Amino acid sequence: PQQWEIKDGKTLVMDVPAKTDFWRISHYGFTVDHGPFYYATYGGEFEAKVKITGNYVTTFDQMGLMLRIDHENWIKAGVEYVDGKQNVSAVVTHRTSDWSVVQLPDAPRSIWIKAVRRLDAVEIFFSRDDKEYIMMRTCWLQDNCPVMVGLMGACPDGKGFTATFE
């Protein structure tokens, strides 16, 4: 990310800039592959978890976890703001992107997102309290190769927003 700050050693605050997104082809017919992505590279099996709090303003404002092998193979999961509502969302990309989304019945201040990689499978969960986790997606991701794992944000249509990760 261009503008970010680490507070109290455990909180990352980033300004998500306008005109950013991660999406490949599909029936929408466009590809965008740029946005803030703060990551470390891991191999083998792992679990990644983050608490996300967004100041969502415009439709498609989004933030969460990203697991990325390269520009054609990646997963992003988190909250996406659509038509004034928060949604838990996952996009899985293997050459083309797909999108699964479930509207939340309210607007929680924060959501926890967790990704668990076992061999060539990734399970994605969300939680409202960091205690009870609900599975939102299971998908394939090539095993035996390094994966960039980290925090992402995107603002395709708005002027940007502030994203907080813990």
List where the protein language model places each region.
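Extracellular glycan-recognition regions
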Residues: 1-166
